[in-house]
Amino acid sequence: MMRVLVVEDNALLRHHLKVQLQDSGHQVDATEDAREADYYLNEHLPDIAIVDLGLPDEDGLSLIRRWRSSDISLPVLVLTAREGWQDKVEVLSSGADDYVTKPFHIEEVMARMQALMRRNSGLASQVINIPPFQVDLSRRELSVNEEVIKLTAFEYTIMETLIRNNGKVVSKDSLMLQLYPDAELRESHTIDVLMGRLRKKIQAQYPHDVITTVRGQGYLFELR
């Protein structure tokens, strides 16, 4: 079973995809626009995304490029009515992993999804080890004492950034930039909320506070 994010502005096609995927045993988040796609991506941590190019608020290729520039590595399957070879090259160059040309059979979508997941699972794992903390960069997972801590995508991004800078203060602005590359979307209180949630989740597995607030400077990850 996979968690699938479907980003398709055509309501009938979006519903058809959602029903077919659910009937195949998958969990599905479906939306018509890029803004809500970002929300589902960050909060529900899908395994794969199916993205149409003609979205109402942002071009699908732009959305994929933005994800890739933020180091979001989940497999992306594009739905496109563009059949020219130049269009297909542009789709793959944007960071998409594969594409299906409209009109299509749902069986082809399912087969390409499965192929992408098999290919993605074969990638070599990259791990940062600061015992007892471990960050799996491929899976985007944080483990403490070999127990995986369930984090949202935003929480994981914060934690990875802090651990990469182990022993160094990371400014609030730097963390906000990791979460919100678009300055217009930044919310100053978000970091404080995320830090509070992170501390609670970590302390359930590790009794010491490893995230320190350095007044006027930022946040510090350090084992004591």
Curated annotation (Swiss-Prot):
Enumerate the spans annotated as Response regulatory domain.
Answer: 3-117
- Indicate the transmembrane segments per the record: none
Superkingdom classification of source: Bacteria
A Gene Ontology biological process in which this protein takes part is:
regulation of DNA-templated transcription
Give the record's PTM text. Phosphorylated by PhoQ.
| Presence of the UniProt keyword DNA-binding in the record | yes
| Assigned keywords, A-Z | Activator, Cytoplasm, DNA-binding, Growth regulation, Phosphoprotein, Repressor, Transcription, Transcription regulation, Two-component regulatory system, Virulence
Supply one GO molecular-function term: transcription cis-regulatory region binding
| GO cellular component terms given for this protein | cytosol; protein-DNA complex
Record-linked InterPro entries: CheY-like_superfamily (IPR011006), OmpR/PhoB-type_DNA-bd (IPR001867), Sig_transdc_resp-reg_receiver (IPR001789), WalR-like (IPR039420), WH-like_DNA-bd_sf (IPR036388)
PTM-bearing positions, type 4-aspartylphosphate: 52
**Gene3D superfamilies membership:** 3.40.50.2300, 6.10.250.690, Winged helix-like DNA-binding domain superfamily/Winged helix DNA-binding domain
State the protein's purpose.
Member of the two-component regulatory system PhoQ/PhoP which regulates the expression of genes involved in virulence and resistance to host defense antimicrobial peptides.
PANTHER family, A to Z = REGULATOR OF RPOS, TRANSCRIPTIONAL REGULATORY PROTEIN PHOP
The protein here is known as Virulence transcriptional regulatory protein PhoP
Species, as recorded: Salmonella choleraesuis (strain SC-B67)
